[in-house]
């Protein structure tokens, strides 16, 4: 018994592109309350989102028979998830130095504005993702999955 792969684009379903719905929703809610003043803080939350993803099927392991999973490569979720991941990486836009020299007032103001802009972008992307998940987009259950990738059983002998 296995999935009947008939097209190379079906291999994507076996990758680590699935998340449990409740942990994903909880992560969105938790992330909305986080502070993003340093790159380390942004990296931590980005890693928490990345850690939610796993592979749930293999060519010979069937999709779970109960519940749904979030498919982050879905047409609705993928652009939101990718934009969220990109919004966490602001290294090239926010200069964080540990030098003892005192920055000028304008340098401080510019850096503060960039941090604030990054925080707004992150929160905005999280809110968009949470909204789509709350509206039921991006989920897949076994029946929906197997409509795309049929499960074949061994012929009776």
Swiss-Prot record:
GO cellular component: helical viral capsid
SUPFAM superfamilies reported in the protein's UniProt record: TMV-like viral coat proteins
Residue(s) carrying N-acetylserine: 2
Domain of life: Viruses
Entry-linked Pfam families: TMV_coat
GO terms of molecular function: structural molecule activity
Cellular localization per UniProt: Virion
Keyword annotations: Acetylation, Capsid protein, Helical capsid protein, Virion
Chief localization: virion
Entry similarity comment: Belongs to the virgaviridae capsid protein family.
Function noted in UniProt: Capsid protein self-assembles to form rod-shaped virions about 18 nm in diameter with a central canal enclosing the viral genomic RNA.
Name of this protein: Capsid protein
Originating species: Turnip vein-clearing virus
Name of encoding gene: CP
């Amino acid at each position: 018994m296995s999935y009947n792969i008939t097209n190379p684009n079906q291999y994507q379903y076996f990758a680590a592109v699935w998340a449990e719905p409740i942990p994903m929703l909880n992560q969105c809610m938790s992330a909305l309350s986080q502070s993003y003043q340093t790159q380390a803080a942004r990296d931590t939350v980005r890693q928490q989102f990345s850690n939610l993803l796993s592979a749930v099927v293999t060519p010979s392991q069937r999709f779970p028979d109960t519940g749904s999973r979030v498919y982050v490569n879905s047409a609705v979720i993928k652009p939101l998830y990718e934009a969220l991941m990109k919004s966490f990486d602001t290294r090239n836009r926010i200069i964080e130095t540990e030098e003892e020299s005192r920055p000028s007032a304008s340098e401080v103001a510019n850096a503060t504005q960039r941090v604030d802009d990054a925080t707004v972008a992150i929160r905005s992307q999280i809110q968009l993702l949470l909204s789509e998940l709350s509206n039921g987009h991006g989920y897949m259950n076994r029946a929906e999955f197997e409509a795309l990738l049929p499960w074949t059983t061994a012929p009776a002998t």
